Amino acid sequence: MSNIEPSNVKPSNIELGTIPLAEAPATKLEAAYIAKKIAPNNSNPNAPVWVFVHGWGASANTWAPLVDELKSQCEIWLLDLPSFGGNTQAVNSPSAVAADIAKILPANTVLVGWSLGGMLLPLIAQQIEQHWPTKTISHCIGLAANAKFAQGDNYTAAMPAETFQTFCANFNVDPTTTWSRFGLLQAQGDSNRKLVSRQIKALHNAPMPEQFTAWQQALTWLGAIDNRVLLCEITTPFLHLFGEGDALVPADAAVAMAGINPLHQTLVVASAGHVLHFSQPAKIAQIMLARVHAKRNKARVAKSFSNAATEYDSVAYLQQKLANTLCEWVPEQAEKIADLGCGTGYCGLQLQRPERDIYSLDLAQGMLHTARSKALAKQQLFSGVCADIECLPFISNGFDALVSGMSMQWCEDLPAVFSEAHRVLKPNGEMIFSTLGPQTLFELREAWAEADIKLGRQGCVHVNTFIELDRVEIAAKQAGFVIEQTSREIHVLTYDSVMPLMRELKTIGAHNVNPGQEQGLTGKARLKAMAQAYEQFRTAQGVLPLTYEVGFYQLLKV
């Protein structure tokens, strides 16, 4: 995850009433919930509709800054919850609200919710999965939405229960004053606090006397919802965004949510408070769009390594040898360590000490499952998170050390990787990692190129490419790291023929996942031509070599 810096943004000048609308709501239920439908100029009928659900004390107006960023790229529906905005529906439970919203959703949806609205997303997703087989939620994106709003039942990454109870009691006595104080809390901890406060005053309306009772009821929903079990059961993809300075939903919730379901992606947005979409709308829009339109190769990397997880250790002797070297570089005094790209958990097991807390992170859920099984078999604790090294779901200044063995080469954005690593490390924390250089697999790359020329099929990408190690060092320094130690090594594996070489690459998940790869099976003629071309590398000892260029690095955050 990139370290999200505060944007220089102005208060939104959107007046939702002036935005062109799509067709009017057709049913009574739609008329109650849908405040606005906003169609882009060039609408793609196959694209998902983005549906937004606001939080307590707000209305559809809260999304104005994000609408400004997204309106040209997707169709948008803005909903009002019962007794908020223009929705006068009387609904007596969160599950009933979720059922209503599920009924009115279009066939293909990206569902976005903030605070209470975000806590409703798992309930809505459950409704769709269980009762609406013709509808799909392609992504759920929660902003400042915890699994449980207040502490209790062994969940501590939330607002203290006493604080929440006091707030509810104060609202019952003096709703208007309490709502005003709530606005101050929403802006607290945000580097754009003044901007957020102005936006709250402009876009959030205080409750009217006839709304007091319904808003009090909505507060009880906020305290009653506990999505911990549901988040484990639903299959809809989730992205959870949290503000680093949020005074209502602590940033620690990111780790807690990742622990509930390691397949969900979580992200802590630096310098943001509770109303992330007021503070940094451009950045939040960018994050959401990137999630929904994620590059295919990342998904292919995850799938490739997930498929390899069960057999990976049987052929990963080089990877384990390199991991042993890496672990020797980790400071003994490091107590809180994150293993980035943990694979089957080899590094984590080597680093385990009674006094250490180790967090294992991987993009491939299959690898995490294998790592968890290995740890439990050794009666060791396991904390696993399914996430991208470029999008770390951790708070700032939290780790003594980061370890990453042979994973960095799969990242697309090295500046983001090092920026994130620098953010989550404590001062004087260290990042120790190994990665592959461009000489890696050069024999296979050249053999395929020669075969393609012979068969008149130039331009195909058969072998993963790796960046120059000098560029790795430059990116690390630009992020603020000092390079304490570095080493470059060449390792050569040998094989009797090409086929076991290819099978081994597939078994460890390191076969081609680059853009430009031809789809479908590789024909026998092409494999034969490649094998013949590879023969030029056969050594005097009668074996075929396969080269790995490896860089080791120890970085210091100063």
Swiss-Prot record:
Substrate binds at residues 56, 115-116, 182-186, 274. Residues 288-558 are annotated as: Malonyl-ACP O-methyltransferase. Its EC number is 3.1.1.1, 2.1.1.197. SUPFAM superfamilies: alpha/beta-Hydrolases, S-adenosyl-L-methionine-dependent methyltransferases. Residues 1-287 are annotated as: Carboxylesterase. One of its GO terms (molecular function) is carboxyl-O-methyltransferase activity. Keywords: Biotin biosynthesis, Hydrolase, Methyltransferase, Multifunctional enzyme, S-adenosyl-L-methionine, Transferase. The active site is at 115 (nucleophile), 246, 274. Pathway: Cofactor biosynthesis; biotin biosynthesis. GO terms for biological process: biotin biosynthetic process; methylation. It comes from the Bacteria. The keyword Transferase applies. It catalyses: a carboxylic ester + H2O = an alcohol + a carboxylate + H(+); malonyl-[ACP] + S-adenosyl-L-methionine = malonyl-[ACP] methyl ester + S-adenosyl-L-homocysteine. InterPro entries: AB_hydrolase_1, AB_hydrolase_fold, BioC, Malonyl-ACP_OMT, Methyltransf_11, SAM-dependent_MTases_sf. Converts the free carboxyl group of a malonyl-thioester to its methyl ester by transfer of a methyl group from S-adenosyl-L-methionine (SAM). It allows to synthesize pimeloyl-ACP via the fatty acid synthetic pathway. In the N-terminal section; belongs to the AB hydrolase superfamily. Carboxylesterase BioH family. PANTHER family: ARGININE-HYDROXYLASE NDUFAF5, MITOCHONDRIAL. This is Biotin biosynthesis bifunctional protein BioHC. It comes from Saccharophagus degradans (strain 2-40 / ATCC 43961 / DSM 17024).
